[in-house]
Amino acid sequence: MSRFTFKQFHINQDSCAMKVSTDGILLGAWADVKHCKNILDMGSGTGLLALMLAQRTEENCQIQAVELDPIAVKQAQENINDSVWKNRIQLIQTDIQHFLQTTAQTFDLIVANPPYFEQGIACKNEERELARYTKQSHLNWLEWAATRLSENGRISFVLPYEAGKTLIKSTALFCIKQTNVITKIGKTPQRMLLTFAKQPQVLMQDQLVIYDADNQYTEAFIKLTKDFYLKF
């Protein structure tokens, strides 16, 4: 699908390596945006997360989206320019680590749908490989993000379930929210939505089931994503 149309914006993705995914949509709808004035989207791809978060936040919230791949940057800029939030989203083409080491800005929310496929799986093109693979671990991404987090800020990731469990054990940050994502009722969790903070808080844990036993979307999934999907 070369274009993915949402209720308030669209994503052109014909030349971008990584397409719109349920993972990204879940994170964009799930991340806590309360009291956010500055948001960072790490590894923006098509610009999906930046646009979803722009839709969910107030006009005074500014969003910076960082992406290394020049082809993805070109397409993301087109998507942003076609939206009503183009004046609130700044797209930056650079390496994430370099950006975080050089910016003076701190962020109230940092989001990422990071690469998680292991090295060694063949990809058809270099751009897709760049988007899917990383020599850096999820812990690296989290630690880099933490350096530019405001005192009461939050970092939210979507990860494979086992990778999420590993990250929670590995970081010195506090996991304050965890949602285990189950594709269909009765199955084991496949994904994990996580929020980390510098300060300890009571951990909020729950689960989200996407499909019920009749292969229909659950009420919880519809409630979470209804502001975006045309079908709801």
UniProtKB/Swiss-Prot annotation:
Subcellular location: Cytoplasm
Chemical reaction(s) catalysed: adenosine(37) in tRNA1(Val) + S-adenosyl-L-methionine = N(6)-methyladenosine(37) in tRNA1(Val) + S-adenosyl-L-homocysteine + H(+)
Cited Gene3D superfamilies: Vaccinia Virus protein VP39
HAMAP family in alphabetical order: tRNA_methyltr_YfiC
Entry-linked PANTHER family: TRNA1(VAL) (ADENINE(37)-N6)-METHYLTRANSFERASE (PTHR47739:SF1)
Function: Specifically methylates the adenine in position 37 of tRNA(1)(Val) (anticodon cmo5UAC).
Protein name: tRNA1(Val) (adenine(37)-N6)-methyltransferase
